[in-house]
Amino acid sequence: MAKKVIKMVKLQIPAGKANPAPPVGPALGQAGVNIMGFCKEFNARTADQAGLIIPVEITVFEDRSFTFITKTPPAAVLLKKAAGIESGSGEPNRNKVATVKRDKVREIAETKMPDLNAASVEAAMRMVEGAARSMGIVIED
């Protein structure tokens, strides 16, 4: 029989930089998970994606064992990296902070495809363009 799930924890952690300090420690400590075991495994799995924030879904079982799934980085993080900016615009309708080429948007959409519920790359591109628009980033051809 399959192990009984007692908790699902969703976190966004910088790649290769998980440590027992907040937010990781308290979230996993409540579930009774071996925090250092998770940190070592997460850091090993995400070492090649340094500098990006990686969403992770941790499933905790009754016997306090766990499994986790890493997702693709949020579109906003990938857009900020592509545009070379620290943060988006506070007033995206008035202040535009950067421009990104459409081929870069396609690249981001292809990266995000496994996590998006889009039927095609074009639909995924529209989702990424929407995220860019709400951050004050202009898309140009």
Swiss-Prot record:
CDD domains (alphabetical):
Ribosomal_L11
Keyword Ligase belongs to the record: no
What is the name attached to this protein's record? Large ribosomal subunit protein uL11A
The entry's family comment says: Belongs to the universal ribosomal protein uL11 family.
- The source's superkingdom equals Bacteria
Species source reads Bacillus cereus (strain ATCC 14579 / DSM 31 / CCUG 7414 / JCM 2152 / NBRC 15305 / NCIMB 9373 / NCTC 2599 / NRRL B-3711)
Q: Which Pfam families match?
A: Ribosomal_L11 (PF00298), Ribosomal_L11_N (PF03946)
GO cellular component assignments: cytosolic large ribosomal subunit
Q: SMART domains this protein is in?
A: RL11
- Describe the processing and modification events after translation: One or more lysine residues are methylated.
Q: Does the keyword Ribonucleoprotein apply?
A: yes
Tell me which PANTHER family the record gives.
60S RIBOSOMAL PROTEIN L12, LARGE RIBOSOMAL SUBUNIT PROTEIN UL11M
Biological process (GO), any one: translation
Subunit organization: Part of the ribosomal stalk of the 50S ribosomal subunit. Interacts with L10 and the large rRNA to form the base of the stalk. L10 forms an elongated spine to which L12 dimers bind in a sequential fashion forming a multimeric L10(L12)X complex.
Function field: Forms part of the ribosomal stalk which helps the ribosome interact with GTP-bound translation factors.
